[in-house]
Amino acid sequence: MTVMQNAANKAAKRLLRDFMEVENLQVSVKGPGDFVSQADMRAEATLREELEKARPGYGLLMEESGASGSDKWAWRWIVDPLDGTTNFLHGIPHWAISIALEKRLPDGGSEINAAIVYCPVNGEMFWAEKGVGAYLNDRRLRVSARRDFKEALFATGIPFAATSAGNRLAFARTLGALMPATAGVRRFGSAALDLAWVAAGRYDGYWEMGIKPWDIAAGMLIVREAGGYATDGEGKDNIDSVVVAANPHLHPKLLELVRDGLAAKQG
């Protein structure tokens, strides 16, 4: 945990400097609605350097540079150096550094053993270790206890042009079912923080389609260690392109609505 937090703190210093001079950053386009800036690349380079120095035998899966290290890794870092790039580039102070530590299991599967989601703008460090619990800085986290869907506040990510038409259709159906049945749906633009906020009880649930592993690997563990459920679109513990997270009372219904939406995509 100390390794992850130290690496994130070092990358955060540079990101905060870049955020204050965001209009001077060079920006390129990876795809429709998908941007990468000098800030992303510099933060990723810092995180890579710090993590490799501390744990030289570990694998790496990073948003901008992909997978590196041995294919036979026993442990691997999953890193998003800047989750919420579009917010960052527009001067919106809602973005985060996300780091997860993945362990390979004897059966060939894997699990996330430790995670942090760090928002440098306000100094909130969400973190969790498997079996130890989830924390915001030094305060223990618990998901909300809300049971009534009509009183629940949800978060999501909107699939833009970079995602498939099927994902957009599935999202529209799920959102259409949720909007009249809840207290509201928010879209703030950082999957890692959305999950961390579910763990903190700020949101009662969150779902997204067309997501990447580095966006959600850390946040899913934080939700689970805070007493919530974080699954794929089938209700399994996999890190997949669909994520559904909520407190234990609301997750079954949210998952049902997401499945209904995904059925529209397949149809």
Go through each PLM region and give its residues:
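DPxDG-like acidic metal-binding loop motif
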Residues: 71-135
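Short acidic/glycine-enriched loop/turn segments that link adjacent beta-strands
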Residues: 32, 122, 237-240
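N-terminal subdomain of lithium-sensitive/metallo-dependent phosphomonoesterases centered on the IMPase/IPPase/PAP
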Residues: 1-82, 259, 263-267
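Generic detector of well-ordered alpha-helical packing
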Residues: 41, 64, 81-84, 88, ...
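An extended, acidic
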Residues: 142-267
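Solvent-exposed alpha-helices and their adjacent loops that cap or buttress functional pockets
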Residues: 28, 69-71, 107-109, 127, ...
